[in-house]
From Swiss-Prot:
Known role: Produces ATP from ADP in the presence of a proton gradient across the membrane. The catalytic sites are hosted primarily by the beta subunits.
InterPro entries found in the cross-reference section: AAA+_ATPase, ATP-synt_VA_C, ATP_synth_F1_bsu, ATPase_a/bsu_AS, ATPase_alpha/beta_chains, ATPase_F1/V1/A1_a/bsu_N, ATPase_F1/V1/A1_a/bsu_N_sf, ATPase_F1/V1/A1_a/bsu_nucl-bd
Protein family per UniProt: Belongs to the ATPase alpha/beta chains family.
Organism: Synechococcus sp. (strain CC9605)
Protein name in UniProt: ATP synthase subunit beta
Length: 487
């Protein structure tokens, strides 16, 4: 889908060279398209095959030629075919009509649900918000998830890195965040699937429908728009699909004045696609073979994710770390932009602690007294020091048993185990698996609950009472129920 075009639109050029997804197109003198303009190629090749694709101008070569990168396969494309300058960048549909739908990089619906119910479109290339428009006062974004709100709080309009292997609960955590922002903040979400498996994209769509995040019967009640450029697609599509998703999110922020969640899975694949395109365009590679423009490519995307005085885009980005090397230029460049990291731990998942967020490895720049307040800061640090001490004592416990510990250490272990259990929480989107109603816990309730555990006020309650509950009052009610059952 391409926006209404200016006067330069409609200029016709001729394809002079095709190398994989890269094409060189010759235009009449003085009629060259601008960088990032979309070129449309439609027609039949000499073999009689239908060809239809969009390409994006990347370089001006001289001799009235431009070099463009195709957004879909170039099979059947031949020299001499006609390319038309649309006069504008690739543009995607925006607004309420995008909710519940799946789009490709060009904003075309790919879910077989018919045309999109919106006439508004927006170009995927835009400047980041002006510094005068930004909300400069840091504000905590409450998620209703205890472990995140207490130990690694998200910044409204900030960027969060989500680290975790397969099967530790990334998708369920993403679904819960989408559900909570819709219910508590009245906001919507946009999901950008960048260079990941098609099967995962399909599974996510089906899970969204099951959990009610997408309402298949009435799409207008859906809470998320999906934008996919999967790993079987050309690098041009994978490089630009993140911008397509971001453009949809910007409309909800700037026009609807909403708080928006933007999920990008996976931000590394965005860099990887940029690296492939850079090599195809003949640029000299830099460190580890990445593109020389790595910093500006990542910055152009990340700087548009911001909180303005009108609304905010809070971005949660899954980060793949190649060969677990955090010094690799791709994750290292991404880290510079992140405000918080949420690390999912397989050991916690195997214990049945869900969400399996690691309370010691997850970090946030928001966790400082000037932002969250003294009480929140003190409680979070006390929880972390208690869990750290428990971690240090585990070797001794494994070898000698609990009885060999001092009275103080035994008390610490007892409270740490209760804290660990209390960090678990039933999710709304997991109700269909667990049979437990989901819980949204306010930040003040979370802080009060952990303070009571650490102060020893709940030492007499059984550990089981702290597992998979919402606030501390539910712990007390569950303890009474357990006591009644054991009589």
């Amino acid at each position: 889908m391409v926006a209404s075009a200016p006067a330069s639109a409609g200029t016709k050029g001729v394809i002079r060279q095709v190398i994989g997804p890269v094409l060189d197109v010759e235009f009449p003198a003085g009629k060259l398209p601008k960088i990032y303009n979309a070129l449309r190629i439609e027609g039949k090749n000499p073999a009689g095959d239908d060809v239809a694709l969009t390409a994006e101008v990347q370089q001006l070569l001289g001799d009235h030629r431009v070099r463009a990168v195709a957004m879909s396969g170039t099979d059947g494309l031949v020299r001499g075919m006609e390319a038309v300058d649309t006069g504008a960048p690739i543009s995607v549909p925006v607004g309420e009509g995008t909710l519940g739908r799946i789009f490709n990089v060009l904003g075309e619906p790919v879910d077989e649900q018919g045309p999109v119910n919106t006439t508004a479109t927006a170009p995927i290339h835009r400047d980041a918000p002006n510094i005068t428009e930004l909300e400069t006062k840091p504000k905590v974004f409450e998620t209703g998830i205890k472990v995140i709100d207490l130990l690694a709080p998200y910044r409204q309009g900030g960027k969060v890195g989500l680290f975790g292997g397969a099967g530790v609960g990334k998708t369920v955590l993403i679904q819960e965040l989408i559900n909570n922002i819709a219910k508590e903040h009245g906001g919507v979400s946009v999901f950008g699937g960048v260079g990941e498996r098609t099967r995962e994209g399909n599974d996510l769509y089906e899970e969204f429908k099951e959990s009610g995040v997408i309402n298949a019967d009435d799409l207008s009640k859906s809470k998320v728009a999906l934008c996919y450029g999967q790993m079987n697609e050309p690098p041009g599509a994978r490089m630009r699909v993140g911008l397509s998703a971001l453009t949809m999110a910007e409309h909800f922020r700037d026009v609807n004045k909403q708080d928006v969640l933007l999920f990008v899975d996976n931000i590394f694949r965005f860099v990887q696609a940029g690296s492939e395109v850079s090599a195809l365009l003949g640029r000299m590679p830099s460190a580890v073979g990445y593109q020389p423009t790595l910093g500006t490519d990542v910055g152009a995307l990340q700087e548009r994710v911001a909180s303005t005085v009108e609304g905010s885009i809070t971005s949660i980005q899954a980060v793949y770390v190649p060969a677990d090397d955090l010094t690799d230029p791709a994750p290292a460049t991404t880290f510079a932009h992140l405000d918080a990291t949420t690390v999912l731990n397989r050991a916690l998942a195997s214990k049945g602690i869900y969400p399996a967020v690691d309370p010691l490895d997850s970090t946030s720049t928001m966790l400082q007294p000037a932002v969250v307040g003294d009480e929140h800061y003190r409680t979070a640090r006390a929880v972390q020091s208690t869990l750290q001490r428990y971690k240090e004592l585990q070797d001794i416990i494994a070898i000698l048993g609990l009885d060999e510990l001092s009275e103080d250490d035994r008390r610490t272990v007892d409270r740490a185990r209760k804290v660990e259990k209390f960090l678990s929480q039933p999710f709304f989107v997991a109700e269909i698996f667990t049979g437990m109603p989901g819980k949204y816990v306010k930040l003040e309730e979370t802080i009060a609950g952990f303070n009571q555990i650490l102060a020893g006020e709940l030492d007499s309650l059984p550990e089981a009472a702290f597992y998979l509950v919402g606030n501390i009052e539910e712990v007390k009610a569950k303890a009474e129920k357990i006591a009644a059952e054991t009589k």
